[in-house]
């Protein structure tokens, strides 16, 4: 769990997201409270429940970006889902409990990767020995060959016994090891045997009630797995593949599952987007709105705290933090079920973005669009320079189109930038060595006619 203070979390989010200070403060406090809770006594820790958050704001103002950056900061199991992907129990589609199952899968992946890092050096040593056995095989005594037999799925069981290497063989092996570590053998092609990961065709399996935690695809994959497959690869690639396989053997999966479930239960974060799309609008409760209300009712126990069956065991959602968000343009937060409103006690409204924010978005973040496009053109040996006047003109046009057409917030900058640099991107390979300056005149020449025509801008920008 992250040990950042709320001020440090906000500062980190400021590197990528402009404005929206109230939303940043809310998620920063929530994240810090997870850290505080971990340091309480066991009895008190059980009583401290997360204060779930509802972020309200139009599209393109930073709700999803805040969630994405928070995931990297949290160093905790994190999943982003759309409420519209789920259906009420009894309808065809995914049920809301699959949110927790997916979160557990994220936790398993995270803990497994951490465990592999810890055994990396040991795995590399074992992979190196396997490579040396392939590059410089020792002669077999032949003893035990008669006892070899084929197993249930056709793989040979039993192997020849290797003799003790002679002094000369040991010396040759050390020379080969030195060449291997120096990278002199990286381009040589060899055949290696890897455990085959059987791919089961993707299919949607509707399981009976009570069997949701059983993954039939994993069961089928397990039945067909276990074989080895010979691949011809270069030594450098072989080292990576063998290291990965050896690391997998060294990791204790039972421990991984226990740690992952504990981490999900105590530190898991779910970002639930598009919650407004499952609201019954106003007084309408007919047709599809019945199913929408059903999704909300299914979410209630999950957000409040329940036990979900997964293939790794039972998982409690009592202390999972839920951050919900929605534009709420057609529906209002008050259209949510009262019980669900009560389980989202912290409300944060995000402001719409205007010209001033667009100028900052184009210049201040570390991953600003202007820097991204300059880097892309730099690959073609073109120096792309944006002047302050050019950025002002870009922000002005994006704001104007948002006002006259659909307001999609900062996402409008992507469409404007693509149209602005369309000709340059196409002809870049033929213009290597040039210096292209994007000033107000360049922007107006490329975009002003389109932005001025309201009907045309709806389709192009």
Curated annotation (Swiss-Prot):
Keyword Repressor: no
S-S pairs: none
UniProt: ATP binding residues: 18, 60-65, 273, 339, 411
Region listing for Disordered, in residue ranges: 157-178
InterPro entries: AAA+_ATPase (IPR003593), ATP-dep_Clp_protease_ClpX (IPR050052), ATPase_AAA_core (IPR003959), Clp_ATPase_C (IPR019489), HslU (IPR004491), P-loop_NTPase (IPR027417)
GO cellular component, one term: HslUV protease complex
Any coiled-coil regions, as ranges: none
Subunit and interaction comment: A double ring-shaped homohexamer of HslV is capped on each side by a ring-shaped HslU homohexamer. The assembly of the HslU/HslV complex is dependent on binding of ATP.
Described purpose of this protein according to its UniProt entry: ATPase subunit of a proteasome-like degradation complex; this subunit has chaperone activity. The binding of ATP and its subsequent hydrolysis by HslU are essential for unfolding of protein substrates subsequently hydrolyzed by HslV. HslU recognizes the N-terminal part of its protein substrates and unfolds these before they are guided to HslV for hydrolysis.
Full protein name: ATP-dependent protease ATPase subunit HslU
Gene coding for it: hslU
């Amino acid at each position: 769990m992250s040990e950042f203070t709320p001020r440090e979390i906000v500062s980190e989010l400021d590197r990528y997201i402009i404005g929206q200070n109230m939303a940043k403060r809310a998620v920063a406090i929530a994240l810090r409270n997870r850290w505080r809770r971990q340091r309480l006594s066991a009895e008190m820790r059980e009583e401290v429940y997360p204060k779930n958050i509802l972020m309200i704001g139009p599209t393109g103002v930073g709700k999803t970006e805040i969630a994405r950056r928070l995931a990297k900061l949290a160093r905790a199991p994190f999943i982003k889902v759309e409420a519209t992907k789920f259906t009420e129990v009894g309808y065809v589609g995914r049920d809301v409990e699959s949110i927790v199952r997916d979160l557990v899968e994220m936790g398993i992946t995270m803990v497994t990767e951490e465990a592999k890092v810890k055994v990396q050096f040991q795995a590399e040593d074992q992979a190196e020995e396997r490579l040396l056995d392939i590059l410089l095989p020792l002669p077999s005594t032949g003893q035990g060959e008669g006892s070899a037999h084929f197993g249930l799925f056709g793989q040979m069981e039993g192997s020849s016994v290797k003799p003790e290497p002679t002094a000369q063989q040991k010396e040759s092996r050390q020379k080969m090891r030195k060449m291997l570590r120096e990278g002199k053998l990286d381009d040589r092609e060899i055949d290696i045997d890897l455990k085959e990961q059987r791919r089961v065709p993707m299919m949607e399996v509707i399981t009976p009630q009570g069997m949701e935690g059983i993954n039939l695809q994993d069961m089928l994959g397990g039945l067909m797995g276990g074989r080895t497959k010979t691949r011809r690869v270069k030594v450098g690639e072989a080292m990576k593949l063998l290291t990965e396989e050896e690391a997998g053997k060294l990791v204790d999966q039972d421990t991984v599952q226990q740690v992952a479930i504990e981490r999900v239960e105590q530190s898991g974060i779910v970002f639930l987007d598009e919650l407004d799309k499952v609201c019954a609008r106003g007084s309408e409760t007919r047709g599809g709105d019945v199913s929408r209300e059903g999704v909300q009712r299914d979410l209630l126990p999950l957000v409040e705290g329940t036990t979900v069956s997964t293939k790794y065991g039972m998982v409690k959602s009592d202390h999972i933090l839920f951050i919900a968000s929605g534009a709420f343009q057609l529906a209002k937060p008050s259209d949510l079920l009262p019980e669900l409103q009560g389980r989202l006690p912290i409300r944060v409204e995000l402001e719409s973005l205007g010209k001033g924010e667009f100028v900052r978005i184009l210049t201040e973040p570390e991953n600003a669009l202007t820097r991204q496009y300059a880097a892309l053109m730099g690959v073609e040996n073109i120096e792309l320079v944006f002047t302050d006047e050019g950025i002002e003109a870009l922000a002005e046009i994006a704001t104007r189109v948002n006002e006259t057409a659909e307001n999609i917030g900062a996402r409008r900058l992507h469409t404007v930038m693509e149209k602005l640099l369309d000709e340059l991107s196409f002809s870049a390979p033929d213009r290597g060595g040039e210096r292209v300056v994007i000033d107000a005149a360049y922007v107006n020449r490329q975009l002003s006619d389109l932005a001025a025509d309201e009907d045309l801008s709806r389709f192009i920008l």
